[in-house]
Amino acid sequence: MTAPTTTSPSSEATTTTTTTTLNTIATLHQSLTTETTPLPVRFRALFSLKHVAATHPATSAESLAAIDAIAAGFASPSALLKHELAYCLGQTANGAAIPYLTAVLEDTGEDAMCRHEAAEALGALGDVASLGVLKRFRDREGEEVVVTETCELAVERIEWENGEGKKAEKLRASDFSSVDPAPPTAQGQEEQTVEELGNALMDTSLPLFKRYRAMFALRDLASPPDLPTAVPAVLALAKGFADSSALFRHEIAFVFGQLAHPASIPALTEALSNTEEASMVRHEAAEALGSLGDEEGVEETLRKFLHDAEAVVRESVIVALDMAEYEKSNETEYALIPEAQGTA
């Protein structure tokens, strides 16, 4: 006689948890892809999906469903949302995102800001199989400069990640968990000073990858904000807004958003207020100011640009004001993550 099949309580609990998470993903998917959903809610849904994708095993049903849900958002007409989708996919450390990102990069009719973010995300994922497509668009005649430069960085990052250089280098411990377009400058026997890193940051004779490394080294010297090097590092970074590369300038604004240091407010305000500045820089400056929303005068500055001529700037201000409200609230997590799943 065949013994009856039994299911252990632990496997039943796992199945129930998986089902609950998949149901949550479906709800978040709906919020993310519904154009009538307020943009801040869609962003919070996106960050929740990124959390699920990054905190579950890469081949799990939950992680794959979350990545599929994020990628479904690429059908949106919002360049701001699509570029954020690409960034989030690059932060998942999951190769399942690569086909979606490759498709965005290869779509020459797509907004250059989205394609740049897709290339950067491929670099963050670090798969050598992506080198071919990245080199193709790095070298493509007539390509948008922002895409060319990003592909150059992504190729260098993947080669560094998979080469001997990474193994031999000693990197300063960072307060930031993000996978960046370049690692910080490696530490030598003596740590480089803010002045030395600032000089490297602005040295246009250096490869872009090395300048980015100086940028992220300066970022790490500015956190926590009470470090003696923090304000000097922020001021050194702010000089990067004078660079000729819009990609470089936008990355300075992104770093300021990570740092949320009050000393960056004047430079960010100037970048946002300059209507001659590239929209990808202004939008990043707006979002960075959103991370400083509890500082005096920041919300008033942002509200001035709610009706900006550039859609990506207008939308960024909406999201930034939502972030500012979060900064002033008692909420512990910006994303819409159910309590049962924990927080990042």
Swiss-Prot record:
Fe cation 1 binds at residues 83-84, 116-117. Fe cation 2 binds at residues 250-251, 283-284. HEAT-like PBS-type repeats lie at residues 81-107, 115-140, 210-240, 248-274, 281-308. InterPro entries: ARM-like, ARM-type_fold, Deoxyhypusine_hydroxylase, HEAT_type_2, PBS_lyase_HEAT. One of its GO terms (molecular function) is deoxyhypusine monooxygenase activity. Keywords: Cytoplasm, Hypusine biosynthesis, Iron, Metal-binding, Monooxygenase, Nucleus, Oxidoreductase, Repeat. It is found in: Cytoplasm; Nucleus. It is an enzyme of class 1 (oxidoreductase). Its EC number is 1.14.99.29. SUPFAM superfamilies: ARM repeat (SSF48371). Gene3D superfamilies: Leucine-rich Repeat Variant (1.25.10.10). Catalyzes the hydroxylation of the N(6)-(4-aminobutyl)-L-lysine intermediate to form hypusine, an essential post-translational modification only found in mature eIF-5A factor. Belongs to the deoxyhypusine hydroxylase family. This is Deoxyhypusine hydroxylase. It comes from Chaetomium globosum (strain ATCC 6205 / CBS 148.51 / DSM 1962 / NBRC 6347 / NRRL 1970) (Soil fungus).
